[in-house]
Amino acid sequence: MLTKLKLSLRNINFNLYLALLLLGFVPTIYNTLRVFLLGQLPGEWSFSIAGQLSWVNLLYEIINEAIILPLFYFLGQTKSDRAILSNRIHTGFLATFGIYVVLTTMVIVFAEPMLACMATDPSIIPASASYIRIESVANLFAILTQFVLVALVTVGKIKYLYVFTGARLMLYLVADTYLVSTLPFSANLGVNGIGYSNILVNALLLAAAATLLAKEGIHIFARGAFSFGWMREFAKIGSISGLESLVRNVAYTMMISRMVNIVNEQGTYWVANNFIWGWLLLPVLQLGELIKQEVSSNRQNIRRNSLGYFAITTMIAVLWLVSIPGWKPFMVHVLGFDEVEKLFSLVLLLMGFYIFFAFQNVFDATFYGLGKTNYMLFESVITNSLYYGAAFCLYKAGIWIPTLTGIALLFGLGNVFDSIVSFAAYAFLLKKQNINILNPQPGEIENSPAP
């Protein structure tokens, strides 16, 4: 088995993994800086106001996963025909713009009712509404920038992805310093400054990306006769991914985000999520991106590399355990969070459940790499209807009373339940495709297309 494991690890593209880690580390840096800056602001509600954006972003995530995830495939299909590619980029950009304008308008108009529905503390609803309205505009620029970057990668300009990632970091550092910080020369815009910073940075990056794309002969703002016919097939594929995200995020919004608001712990939960998703899960999520790339390029990589994927995941989990003594100093001196004991206990509790998530990440990334989004939809329907459906009934019956620890346990056990369902789907897929991940033989290097 050890020989097979070494063989599997040698097959993995660690250079690409390192590049993905560096790309993922950039948003971790500026998000951590933002947590620190919020901790320096006067008043006790800064984290809670910023935390309201977490459930708003879930609305955008649903559309994002329905559009961006299938986009690489549909643009990649036509990269050899510049005329068809240009049409798809132009029409796709217009459709994305239209969808996000509608969503952004809805958030702006219904901000207060949505906050009330989410059981937000009435005293912070006006400030929270102002903030999420600003962020909704920023999200519009962000998704359009992401769309154009996908187009640039499709035409072979992947180097721009690295350039824009570095530029994004520098722009955020400068913008946040001048708009959010408490330094003497800062505009001192508080939490809203983060939203304005996002608008400024993403608008600049969108303009730059569109200019570079125009130099490649593709003008997203050009006038002319364009065909939207290809989007019928795009909608079929995107709807499955979007439906899976809808089921998953609606359950999370109502059973986790709303419950956290009910117990007035949105700030603590938001900072905990930033720490977990920004630092602990960074290598896990980027491993998932690597798996998607390797599996989509050659389905035989499931058999050849999966042992290595699980070994890397195990090493990441061990590193989490080793790093625990450094968490409190980091939370005090870097995050600047006052209630460190509460934050530390919450992260420590959630970490055990996220180990299950880390291994599930291998299963789910394999599904995405093969284009089997129907497996993801199956997971979401089973987990969110059975597990969270039962939890909701217990809550309405007054049997389960939400507390911060209780909500964390609810979410964590949901992760375990979802991981079990995902593993069952993964085992079914391997059996159906006749793939034995315990036998990464070196002799079979053929390029076999994904089913």
Regions found by a protein language model. Give the residues of each.
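Helix-terminus/linker motif at the lipid-water interface of multi-pass membrane proteins
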Residues: 28-48, 115-122, 178-189, 246-282, ...
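Small-residue-rich hydrophobic transmembrane alpha-helices
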Residues: 48-101, 105, 145-154, 269-323, ...
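Interhelical loop/hinge segments that connect adjacent transmembrane helices in multipass membrane
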Residues: 1-17, 127, 187-198, 207-249, ...
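Interfacial/gating helices of multi-pass transporter permease domains
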Residues: 38-61, 123-129, 191-192, 233-238, ...
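Alpha-helical transmembrane segments of multi-pass membrane transporters/permeases
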Residues: 83, 151-178, 192-195, 199, ...
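Membrane-interface helix-loop junctions in multi-pass transport and translocation proteins
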Residues: 169-206, 325, 385-423, 432-434
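Short membrane-interface helical motifs at transmembrane helix boundaries
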Residues: 102-129, 318-344
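Alpha-helical transmembrane segments of multi-pass membrane proteins
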Residues: 109, 122-148, 276-279, 338-363, ...
